[in-house]
Amino acid sequence: MQSISPETIFRGNDAWQKSLPHIIKLTKSPLILGRGIHTNNLRNKIFRDLKNQNLNVKCANLRFDCCYEDISRINNIVLKNNIDSVIAAGGGKVLDAGKYISDCLDIPCITVPLSASTCAGWTALSNIYTKYGQFIKDVALGSCPKILVYDHKFIQTAPSRTLASGIADALAKWYESSITSSKIDDGLVQQAIQISRVLRDQLLIDGEKAFRSQFENNLSWRNTVEACGLTAGLVGGIGGEKCRTAAAHAIHNAITQIITTNKFLHGEIVGVGLLLQLRLEGMKNNNKLADQSIKQLLVLMKQLNLPTTIAQLGINVFENNNLEKI
């Protein structure tokens, strides 16, 4: 079985308000799951709006990460309070935790991304970490979220750094899937690869404009945030596990074992992993296309203030066998 997309998607400037009639049909006792203090105001709005719909609303926050300690604690909250859905409102870790908890307890999940930093609001996948942010594994879930609310006004309040991170993460879709899946004889997978190529081209064209015009909510910005949060998720939905991870994300997972990950966003680390992946490709058979891709990506990544080297992530490869770990 393959879950390709959320059952219902609301997108645009008033997506949250438009979603409310559908949410109240789905749930009577939702749990709003969040984490960071920077998104408190938005979560409070979500809480008030649901209360005004006469729902019995509870709230809970992750203390650490999308980790088993937090998941177990929130599972207990859900069971003790007869919660019938989870509304995950936040970044990738919150969205992944909400999806995982809903999957474990067989209740609907509603994802409300509050930044464009990942496509986690779309996918039937959760990445599990230790409470210190070290990657453990990814878990394929039974289905994508029941409802995805991609409200541009919510996302517009996020720091521009989160958009830069989302661009780096989404760019990796093409470079990874073209390696892992290019020879697979599966029509859907091949179509996913082609979508990821168009996604890459759009981000190379609009990415820097969007980063500089976040508070204008113009066409470049709208196209880019939807590319990061929606189209990137569609690639994973259509391509499935065959379009998931090559060196860029594998390097990210290794780097989380070394550094204090709360200093860096997921896509910031993936971006460095992507450059290293392309460097490895360039070294193999003297691949000139990989070298050209590095030059092209370096221009954009510097415009987006993204780290481009392991050293910029605070790693000395000559200490503690760090190079071997990566």
Listing of model-derived features with the role each one plays in the protein:
Residues W16, T39-R43, K93-K99, T118-W122, ...:
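Short glycine/serine/threonine-rich phosphate/pyrophosphate-binding segments
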Residues M1-S85, I310:
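ATP/NTP phosphate-donor binding region
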Residues T8, P30-L31, D84-I87, P108-I110, ...:
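Structural motif
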Residues E7, D103-I195:
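A glycine/threonine-rich phosphate-anchoring loop and its flanking beta-alpha core
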Residues V78-I101, L105-A116:
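A short, small-residue-rich loop immediately preceding and capping a beta-strand
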Residues D185-V299:
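Active-site segments that bind and position negatively charged phosphate/pyrophosphate groups
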Residues Q2, A170, N286-I326:
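C-terminal charged capping/lid subdomain of soluble metabolic enzymes
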